[in-house]
């Protein structure tokens, strides 16, 4: 009789994830993110206000002097970091290049819908001479397409955890970083609620060179003209534009202004495209630019359903941000940086190899002796013309030259799997570790573990995917019903979304079907907003897949 062998894994995941009303769409949470940062860093607000004062003065000076060289162009190197777990969020390079083309059209006043913009805003919409180009050299001088595809759990992006940027963004004084994710989870409650499209930080919010000087954007909003313009909107914030209805993420509530002369004060619009010619009670008086009652509904920095334009003063403000020392935006378009980032590069790159199990987001794998794992290619950075899979321990590879293959592991022990991908430019190899388990139960009958002996018990495992200081650890500083030993996690050290595992030996339940599994638990919630979770899971395939059992 074949026995089903189970291993129980106990994981405590610490997170602070609010409930979001999915039926609504929140185009932007830039000001929410900024306010959260100001609360966390008492010096940030002072730094930001000083930067804004500098930019305000520089904008006025540039507007008065109108000294911009004829036919001058601000070229900004861009890199997209696509974070994914193998799903639809792993958008294609073609989708990104199409979105970038639309952004450049918006900033060049080159859209096919320009003639439909209401006056006087059609005439106020000018070519910004700002162009965004994919970088072709990374910070180390290596060839890049300017689009990274990174298999990363941070694709479910926690806005509250500003450490998420670490290891993703490239030097923001040399690149505009756009991080594409599957979902943005805001901290606390955001006015308007709903699905978050994107956010960034205006110049001066973070210190120069900070990894957080980037745009975070939902992958689902790059699939149509007006959705793409939401990214043009976020770039506008990154270039120091405010919402036309003021420094808030909640339009339609109160009259607001962006402090620019040629954009009428407005309550703002959400999800509709009202009249630009009348009905704006916030613009009670005529000016030399617009008449009383007018509003620029079609402004890209509004929340309307018909974004089409920037104004002349908005364009001047964005040019000023790029010419300023604030966050060293002036370095982005310098000749030295354009050479270093190789924005005009055309040479193809060798691909960068990457692969994962088709049904797992783990970077290390466990399988029963004689079992198999299906691996899937997630390489990027170049067109791939060849695949070559290899594995140790006498493993059998079903399709060694395909992008997806099943590999069977006949012998217990540690081994490796490697994928080499290549094209005419070069090749690259990725190696991952696999542990093949001898599926012999470590627990064959009734047992008890009180953790009274020093160290992790024989056959048990502590798994800390984040490799940080917050992990399952032993303590003897508690009074339990059967002694003083226990395993615990110091929750104050856990980052949002962190998961840690405590794994038992293999338990033979096939011959012990009348047995039960129980454990003693002590837990206290630090605050009502914390959503810590304890889950008990079991696996029938030596850790290949897991199902919740309690």
Residue ranges and their predicted role:
Residues 397, 541-550:
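Exoplasmic/lumenal beta-rich domain surfaces
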Residues 384-408:
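Surface-exposed, flexible coil segments in extracellular/virion-facing regions
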Residues 494-511:
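Short beta-strands within extracellular/lumenal beta-sheet-rich domains
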Residues 366-379:
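A short beta-strand segment in extracellular, disulfide-stabilized domains
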Residues 22-110:
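Primarily auto-inhibitory N-terminal propeptides
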Residues 444-498, 550:
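Extracellular glycan-recognition surfaces and repeat-rich motifs
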Residues 510-513, 523-531:
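Extended, low-complexity, turn-rich repeat/linker tracts enriched in Gly/Pro/Ser/Thr and Asp/Glu
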Residues 70-72, 78-88, 93-138, 148-354:
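Extracellular (secreted or membrane-anchored) zinc-dependent metallopeptidases
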